[in-house]
């Protein structure tokens, strides 16, 4: 048995094809920098590519320029609210299928349920702050699997 290192590496057979895994891209939109960075870090540690934005207008521009696979979106944002961004994207044929998970403290402040705000915003899911990291990841994975 002869080993051909230049042609096949360390084996006497052709190499297996390389499988290229492309990470899902998630846009994290949150005006509180520390929360935005924590969520983005957590998602990167799970293998996702992240893009960050601190306001609604910038977030919508990023989606229109390079659509992500999913958006984690705060409701209360400067320049354009998360509700407005969500409704604008869901009303656009090109972007309406991008899953949006709204992550906000608004339910705590108003006393209304997550389901109420999910329906009002047109988001695919709605999660209240404070949140558990494991639950956030589970919901993101569920939305991406659809």
Predicted feature residues:
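Acidic catalytic/metal-coordinating carboxylates
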Residues: 55-58, 81-87
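Active-site beta3 strand of CheY-like receiver
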Residues: 67-72, 77
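Charged docking surfaces used in two-component/phosphorelay signaling
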Residues: 37-45
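The feature encodes the CheY-like receiver
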Residues: 36, 78, 96, 108, ...
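Alpha4 helix (beta4-alpha4-beta5 surface) of REC/receiver domains from two-component response regulators
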Residues: 84, 107-127, 134, 138-141
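Conserved acidic carboxylate
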Residues: 30
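Short hydrophobic/Thr-rich beta-strand motif most characteristic of the beta2 strand and flanking loop
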Residues: 47-54, 62
């Amino acid at each position: 048995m002869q080993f051909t290192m230049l042609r096949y590496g360390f084996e006497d057979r052709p190499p297996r094809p390389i499988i290229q895994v492309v990470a899902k891209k998630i846009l994290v939109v949150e005006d509180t920098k520390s929360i935005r960075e924590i969520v983005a870090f957590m998602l990167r540690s799970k293998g996702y590519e992240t893009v960050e934005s601190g306001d609604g207008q910038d977030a919508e521009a990023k989606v229109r320029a390079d659509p992500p696979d999913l958006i984690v979106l705060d409701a209360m944002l400067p320049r354009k609210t998360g509700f407005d961004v969500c409704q604008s994207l869901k009303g656009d044929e090109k972007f309406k299928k991008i899953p949006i998970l709204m992550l906000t403290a608004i339910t705590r402040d108003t006393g209304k349920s997550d389901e109420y705000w999910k329906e009002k915003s047109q988001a695919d899911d709605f999660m209240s702050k404070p949140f558990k990291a494991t639950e956030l990841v589970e919901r993101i994975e569920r939305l991406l699997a659809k």
